[in-house]
Curated annotation (Swiss-Prot):
Belongs to the tstN family. The keyword Glycoprotein applies. This is Phomoidride biosynthesis cluster protein N. CDD domains: PEBP_euk. It comes from Talaromyces stipitatus (strain ATCC 10500 / CBS 375.48 / QM 6759 / NRRL 1006) (Penicillium stipitatum). SUPFAM superfamilies: PEBP-like (SSF49777). It comes from the Eukaryota. Phomoidrides A and B (also known as CP-225,917 and CP-263,114) are potent inhibitors of Ras farnesyltransferase and squalene synthase. CP-225,917 and CP-263,114 inhibit Ras farnesyl transferase from rat brain with IC(50) values of 6 uM and 20 uoM, respectively. CP-225,917 inhibits squalene synthase with an IC(50) value of 43 uM and CP-263,114 with an IC(50) of 160 uM. It holds the Pfam family PBP. Residues 1-18 form the signal peptide. Glycans are attached at residue 93. The keyword Glycoprotein applies. InterPro entries: PEBP, PEBP-like_sf, PEBP_euk.
Length: 198
């Protein structure tokens, strides 16, 4: 835990602007690299077309490698991570609800490239990626946030219902409650983008 706290503190040295939308919790100023198909890279708060984000992105923590310039990676090689993507602007009867678009545990970090990939023997429950598809109207905010995965981690039972690939199942996902029940620390990094349907 001490090593992870030092890891987060050093990553904070790379911060520039907030990497999560105003008011979003848990917030972070640490940059998560998010690159969609055709090399479309997410810059915090910028707009993407829905078809640019229709497939799951490649994630990276290049900011970690920018801090640690030696051949030996600073992070511990046994660490795993989990990522979430959430639409925080789904409206029902005048009230906004968060919609889970993606939950992927068992991500491992390459110390050489800074890229995150799914552990080859992962059998953890997950929520398959669903691209943005907001209704016509104002742009929706899509937040990606990544956490260090605790050792001996298990998905909290209360959240199994959100894994089904339907809007009805995934609506109302409470990331703050998930963090509490899963015993997660503060986010390692985040990013977010806007998507609108004309």
């Amino acid at each position: 835990m001490i090593l992870f706290s030092i890891f987060v503190a050093l990553l904070a040295a790379t911060r520039a602007q907030s990497q999560t939308p105003p008011g979003f919790k848990p917030s972070t100023e640490l940059h998560l690299g998010v690159t969609f198909q055709d090399g479309v890279s997410v810059q915090a708060g910028h707009e993407l077309l829905a078809n640019e984000a229709k497939s799951a992105p490649q994630l990276d923590l290049h900011s970690l490698l920018a801090i640690h310039h030696t051949q030996t990676p600073f992070y511990h090689s046994t660490w795993k991570f989990m990522v979430f993507m959430i639409d925080i602007d789904v409206e029902r009867n005048g009230t906004k609800y968060p919609l889970l678009h993606w939950y992927q545990p068992d991500l491992i970090l390459s110390g050489r490239t800074g890229r995150l990939s799914i552990e080859s023997d992962s059998n953890m429950p997950k929520a398959m990626y669903a691209g943005p598809a907001p209704p016509p109207g104002p742009a929706h905010r899509y937040v990606e946030v990544i956490f260090k995965q605790p050792e001996r981690y298990e998905l909290p039972a209360d959240f199994e219902k959100f894994l089904e690939n339907t809007i009805a199942a995934r609506l109302g996902f409470d990331i703050e409650q998930f963090v509490k029940e899963a015993g997660l620390s503060e986010p390692v990094a985040g990013n977010w983008f806007l998507t609108a349907t004309s």
